[in-house]
């Protein structure tokens, strides 16, 4: 950290989801209204910004304590090349670099899709051990109490429902067909303006239609 982080003026930390867990493209950062971190997050252009507390020992925690603005970009799944996660990540990094004056501006300026800031998130967990049958997709808007999936034991003796604990957007989910009781299955982000968040995700997906040069 001392050899790299201490010499940085701005940081973007690139992450996938865990193994067998996928994430909707999102920015995680501790935001201060009008601060440099918030300006970076808005410039990046991910559909969701999660205003996340710092974790002790993390890169974000280390950098923030030294006054270095830092974003974490989370998208896709570990051990996978997901174009829908990689392309917006590359575009977002380039947008931030242009905003910082590290790169020249675009010849044909494109406005990034507007992002919505989530005011919190939580995981819906498996009620029992068994086989998971998801009922929603990544990026879906869900209502409090809505059915997210069913978990049934292989012999059909028991079945449990996984329901959303809040109105929100599914920003992460398990890809494993098997679930253990208490395992995190669906990550739900909460928004003050849920309609705007849903619209931001739709605009984001529309923006992924490749232009002649998908990166520049």
Q: For each predicted feature, which ranges?
A:
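Structured catalytic-domain cores with a bias toward divalent-metal coordination
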Residues: 1-216
């Amino acid at each position: 950290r001392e050899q790299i982080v201490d010499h940085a003026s701005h940081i973007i930390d690139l992450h996938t989801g865990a193994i067998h867990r996928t994430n909707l493209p999102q920015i995680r950062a501790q935001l201060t209204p009008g601060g440099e971190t918030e300006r970076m997050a808005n410039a990046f252009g991910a559909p969701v910004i999660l205003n996340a507390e710092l974790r002790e020992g993390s890169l974000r925690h280390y950098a923030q304590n030294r006054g270095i603005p830092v974003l974490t970009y989370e998208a896709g799944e570990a051990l996978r090349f997901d174009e829908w996660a990689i392309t917006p990540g590359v575009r977002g990094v380039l947008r931030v670099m242009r905003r910082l004056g590290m790169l020249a501006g675009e010849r044909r300026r494109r406005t990034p899709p507007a992002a919505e800031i989530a005011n919190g998130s939580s995981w819906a967990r498996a009620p029992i051990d068994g086989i998971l049958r998801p009922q929603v997709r990544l990026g879906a808007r869900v209502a409090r109490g809505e059915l997210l999936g069913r978990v049934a034991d292989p012999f059909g003796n028991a079945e449990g429902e996984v329901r959303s604990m809040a109105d929100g957007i599914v920003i992460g989910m398990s890809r494993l067909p098997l679930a253990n009781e208490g395992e995190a299955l669906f990550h739900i982000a909460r928004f003050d303006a849920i309609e705007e968040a849903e619209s931001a995700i739709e605009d984001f997906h529309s923006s992924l239609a490749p232009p002649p040069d998908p990166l520049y």
